[in-house]
């Protein structure tokens, strides 16, 4: 039962779906995001030829023409240490080698802001943008969000740039025609077509994602490219594919535009993502869980607890309520709820429609600032009071409110319990959830270093790979 519970107010890390970039020394290669999914299909971020009924009246030319000139090629250059001979390896003499990865991006403003995937530019020493008319620009990384795999870049141009406008991904319908535009296999802007196959797809198995699923062909190098409707409006950022080979075999996945837009707007305004929380604990209903909880509903979000003092608590949400809609958006599973909350900010008011004792009720809930974060290796961290910090004679840190159940025994055997503090992550002082998010974004695929102050005041440093 405990595994069923999901803490809605916690912004889970997106590392579960972080898939490796295919990079080779001295030559460019397309960055591909892959997700292992049992022995079934795996998942890659990235385009098969389709043959459409010649009798269809759908015209894709307007959307294609509006989009191809705003989709760009992204080249990510990194430097890594390597050994050129056995002697170098034996004596520890390493040399820096250049690695290049490529992907796609979408210009979203005439002054050069570009949205792409975080995994496309991760670890870059330099980023080069090539537009559809073969002009090249050096790009500045403005910010990233590991949770949603979204990054914001900026280029400077003397001319106004072609750009794509955001559409409303909430209004996109299953069965609706869409175009995927990107730069697969280092080609210039390439357009493929398909339909929306599903919405609110969670590929991680941890209820942390909410993708648009399409059958538009997407291949290595398409990561960060545009998913647009037939009006040419941006409704998603192509991020992953379902495949066992690394190439397209039927399904691709995109971050919904409403989520991507919220992320980049927050990065522009605050430098990081501001998450609004509801303040409830629970999980999605299905036939098994419904039986466990003694309810006859098999869809919706079942509230097992309400956090004291949160917006949900003040509004009157109660344990046992089944959330079915928020602001008119149907909540049939957790990824629906997660996807909706990822588009909202602290202080936003939302109308929550829920089932209580067989009666539909509605309440207005004010979302609050995210004050906690989950690090899977250790557990849930919360912003603490000054008194709690003073009790351990420390000036900053996040307090460990709940140990990871998976690793609890190991931590407790080392004297780490709830109430301990994480004061540093990757050599960065941690005084807020935003500090922790930024530090973790620098971690990906590297050694993770965490400084912990025990409840007895002892400070210990841990390293994880």
Named regions from a protein language model:
Residues 3-319, 325-349, 355-362, 366-396, ...:
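Serine-dependent protease modules
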Residues 281, 464-465:
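A beta-hairpin/wing motif
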Residues 320, 419:
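Conserved catalytic motifs of ABC-family nucleotide-binding domains
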Residues 333, 432-435:
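Alpha-helix N-cap recognition
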Residues 421-423:
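Helix-turn-helix DNA-binding module
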Residues 441, 450-453:
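Short, exposed beta-strand-loop hairpins at the edges of beta-sheets
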Residues 456-464:
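Short, low-complexity, Pro/Ser/Thr/Gly-rich segments in the mature regions of secreted, periplasmic
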């Amino acid at each position: 039962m405990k595994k069923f519970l999901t803490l809605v107010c916690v912004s889970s890390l997106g590392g579960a779906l972080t898939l490796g970039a295919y990079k080779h020394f001295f030559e460019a290669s397309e960055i591909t995001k892959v997700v292992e999914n049992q022995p079934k299909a795996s998942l890659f971020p990235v385009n098969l030829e389709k043959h459409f009924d010649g009798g269809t009246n759908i015209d894709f030319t307007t959307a294609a023409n509006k989009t191809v000139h705003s989709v760009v090629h992204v080249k990510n250059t990194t430097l890594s240490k390597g050994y050129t001979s056995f002697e170098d390896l034996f004596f520890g003499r390493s040399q820096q080698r250049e690695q290049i990865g490529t992907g796609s991006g979408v210009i979203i403003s005439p002054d050069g802001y570009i949205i792409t995937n975080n995994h496309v530019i991760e670890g870059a020493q330099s980023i080069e943008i090539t537009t559809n008319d073969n002009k090249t620009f050096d790009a500045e990384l403005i910010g990233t969000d590991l949770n949603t795999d979204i990054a914001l870049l900026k280029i400077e141009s003397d001319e106004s740039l072609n750009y794509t406008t955001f559409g409303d991904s909430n209004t996109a319908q299953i069965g609706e025609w869409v175009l995927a535009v990107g730069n697969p296999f280092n080609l210039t802007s390439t357009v493929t077509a398909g339909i929306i196959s599903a919405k609110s797809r969670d590929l991680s198995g941890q209820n942390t994602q909410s993708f648009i699923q399409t059958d538009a062909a997407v291949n290595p190098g398409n990561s960060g490219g545009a998913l647009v409707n037939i009006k040419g409006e941006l409704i998603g950022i192509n991020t992953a594919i379902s495949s066992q080979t690394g190439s397209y075999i039927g399904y691709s996945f995109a971050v919904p535009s409403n989520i991507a837009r919220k992320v980049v707007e927050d990065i522009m305004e605050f430098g990081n993502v501001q998450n609004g929380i509801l303040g409830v604990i629970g999980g999605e209903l299905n036939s098994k869980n419904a039986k466990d909880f003694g309810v006859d509903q098999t869809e919706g979000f079942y509230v097992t607890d309400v956090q004291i003092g949160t917006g949900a608590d003040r509004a009157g949400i109660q344990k046992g309520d089944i959330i079915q809609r928020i602001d008119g958006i149907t909540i049939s599973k957790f990824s629906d709820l997660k996807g909706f909350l990822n588009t909202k900010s602290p202080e936003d008011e939302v109308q929550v429609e829920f089932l209580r004792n067989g009666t539909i009720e509605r309440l207005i809930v004010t979302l609050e600032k995210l004050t906690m974060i989950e690090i899977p290796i250790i557990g849930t961290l919360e912003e603490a009071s000054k008194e709690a910090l003073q009790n351990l004679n420390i000036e900053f840190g996040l307090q460990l409110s709940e140990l990871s159940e998976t690793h609890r025994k190991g931590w407790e055997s080392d004297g780490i319990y709830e109430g301990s503090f994480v004061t540093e992550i990757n050599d960065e002082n941690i005084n807020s959830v935003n500090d922790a998010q930024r530090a973790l974004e620098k971690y990906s695929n590297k050694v993770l270093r965490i400084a912990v102050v025990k409840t007895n005041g002892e400070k210990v440093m841990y390293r994880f790979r």
